[in-house]
Amino acid sequence: MSAELNVPMDPSAPACPEPGHKGMDYRDWVRRSYLELVTSNHHSVQALSWRKLYLSRAKLKASSRTSALLSGFAMVAMVEVQLETKYQYPQPLLIAFSACTTVLVAVHLFALLISTCILPNVEAVSNIHNLNSISESPHERMHPYIELAWGFSTVLGILLFLAEVVLLCWIKFLPVDAKDQPGSHSHTGWQAALVSTIIMVPVGLIFVVFTIHFYRSLVRHKTERHNREIEELHKLKVQLDGHERSLQVV
């Protein structure tokens, strides 16, 4: 080691290669710069893939929890609701309640099925601490199904749940005091059901407006992020083209 440190050096030779010098030193610098750019781009692509993986896993978890909760509530509501046998319910009300409950349970069970089938495979890959294991995850190929489960669980499923609550209020409160005032729409039960409907309609409208606004904001964010990525790729291309022209000059 001491012999290596005591080797005399030519003062005319540079201590380290600089990009301004011609010859092999300049080519080595260009090659090293090219490898650094390619490596950084490769890591950026892997980071984007892992970000998509974690986003898909979060969506599947939220979809499964929401679907299990709301479908269970709908089933309990249908089983536990007690119809007044002495009261003649309007036929459209019973048909609407039955159809809404069935569609609600079917939609949430379908979303739960998708989440249950895909989530274990995504979890298995996300728990492996290896950057190259991202290619084994099915989240890219199953992306349409993940978005479908997310939409069914959070958008369509919640709208059906709000309609279920309104119909349940009508079935529960409509027979109240109906015997004292037959054929009248001013008894206590009818007024209670009407109040629940009046409250739930603006809530549903607010939910729809918020969903549209959130979706547009999310699309705008993704568009801006993709534009930044395109600009970075363009800068990378310009740098690589400049290095290639420099090599041709050399």
UniProtKB/Swiss-Prot annotation:
Primary localization: membrane
Transmembrane regions listed in the UniProt entry: 66-83, 94-114, 148-168, 192-212
GO MF terms held by the record: store-operated calcium channel activity
GO biological process, one term: store-operated calcium entry
Record comment: activity regulation: CRAC channels are regulated by fast Ca(2+)-dependent inactivation (FCDI), a mechanism that limits Ca(2+) influx and cell toxicity. ORAI2 channels display prominent FCDI. Inhibited by lanthanides such as Gd(3+) ions.
Site (described: Confers selective permeability to Ca(2+) ions): E80
One Pfam family of this chain: Orai-1
GO cellular component: a single term: plasma membrane
Keyword set includes RNA-binding: no
Presence of the UniProt keyword Cytoplasm in the record: no
Bilayer topology term: Multi-pass membrane protein
Superkingdom of this protein's organism: Eukaryota
Keywords from the UniProt entry: Calcium, Calcium channel, Calcium transport, Cell membrane, Ion channel, Ion transport, Membrane, Transmembrane, Transmembrane helix, Transport
UniProt subcellular location: Cell membrane
InterPro entries: CRAC_channel, Orai_sf
Record's catalysed reaction(s): Ca(2+)(in) = Ca(2+)(out)
Family, as annotated: Belongs to the Orai family.
Role of this protein: Pore-forming subunit of inward rectifying Ca(2+) release-activated Ca(2+) (CRAC) channels. Assembles with ORAI1 and ORAI3 to form hexameric CRAC channels that mediate Ca(2+) influx upon depletion of endoplasmic reticulum Ca(2+) store and channel activation by Ca(2+) sensor STIM1, a process known as store-operated Ca(2+) entry (SOCE). Various pore subunit combinations may account for distinct CRAC channel spatiotemporal and cell-type specific dynamics.
Oligomer and partners: Oligomerizes in homomeric and heteromeric ORAI complexes. Native CRAC channels most likely consist of hexameric ORAI heteromers, implying that diverse ORAI1, ORAI2 and ORAI3 subunit combinations with distinct biophysical properties can operate in a cell-type specific way. Interacts with STIM1; this regulates channel activity. Interacts with CRACR2A/EFCAB4B.
Protein name listed in UniProt: Protein orai-2
Organism: Mus musculus (Mouse)
